[in-house]
Amino acid sequence: MYDFVVVGVGPAGARFARRAAETGYDVLALEKGTVGEPLACSGHVSTDIWDYVPEDARDELFQNRIYGANFYTGGPEADAHLFYKTEEISNVIDRVGLDRTLADCARRAGADVREGHTVTGIQEHPDHVDITASVAGEEGTTAFEAKMVAGCDGPVSRLRQAAGLPEPGEKLHGVLAFTDEADHSDHVDVHLTVPRFFAWRIPRGEAGVEYGLAAPPGDDVTALFDRLTDAYGVETDRFCSGAIPIGPPDTVTTDRVFLLGDAAGQTKPFTGGGILYGMTAADCAARHIRPDSPASLGVYESAWRETLSTEIRMGRLIRRAYSLPEPVQRVGLRLLAGEIGVHMDKPSSFFSKDHLRRLLS
């Protein structure tokens, strides 16, 4: 019997598998396909990402440095409002490579990471969980037993449903695609032209340029995306689509199952990004969850919320600005634009002494 079976080997799942294995637990991590595929997420992250990967992987993963963002209330021809820092705000990285690097870290720590394993069902018992999985290229199913199961299988989590846990508050429909021309620009472009969210353009160095957006269900994201790329006069390829969970549910644990990452809605409400929040929650889980102690799941539940709830709550407030009337948005952007002292993962840093000093100057 395993101490933990981890379902899904994205950033949150790989991080937890690594940390739990480093603690000495027997960990099995199952990925339904190939780690990192298909791509369904941007690779624009804060520089904190380098705290989670080996130093020798940085050169391979790194694509571009970002120092600021141009905000628009219209298309690229509209007036731009530049928000910037003199130091790097964020980096653009190889998103598929990140997943594979984190999975390799879990393997080196001692976790058994298996690709091509799709979990088809679980059954909780007082002292363990039965897990059933299909294996690519094989008939029938394979059974595993674990003391605890970590559901890290994304926004449309099969494990969450099987465990009877509630859904995230909202799921946006995100799309992105790429052009191939090199672009080493040091700022991203953000367009407040999408209902209740935004569209973006991210220069990825030699890897090309990423165009994307997210919108609530019911909005025609394809038409919105075509409008974005038409405004820039580009044709894209490698089109990707996926759900973006916004708002964690009231609980992400049962007696022997817990959720991490997108499956738990552990994302930034104002950007939809969840890589750092998911790995932060994974560290909380690894610190507090003990496979022989169902009560420790309650400690994890409290710990991750205490760590992230303020940022998630403030992120919701920022997102409300996306729905303000355009004239109000223009005034707000004009007043706030310039040098900033805000951390892109921590909206509470808007009230930091550093940011307020720069804002007032």
For the regions a language model picked out, list residue spans one by one.
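Glycine-rich FAD pyrophosphate-binding loop
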Residues: 5-9, 15-41
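Conserved phosphate-binding and hydrolysis motifs of nucleotide-dependent enzymes
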Residues: 8-13, 147, 261
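FAD/FMN-dependent oxidoreductases across multiple families
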Residues: 121, 217-292
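C-terminal helical "tail/cap" subdomain of flavin- and related membrane-associated enzymes
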Residues: 290-361
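Conserved N-terminal helical subregion
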Residues: 58, 64-65, 70-162, 172
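N-terminal FAD cofactor-binding segment of flavoenzymes
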Residues: 32-75
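Conserved FAD-binding catalytic core of PHBH/FMO-like flavoproteins
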Residues: 156-222
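Conserved acidic residues
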Residues: 3, 145-147, 256
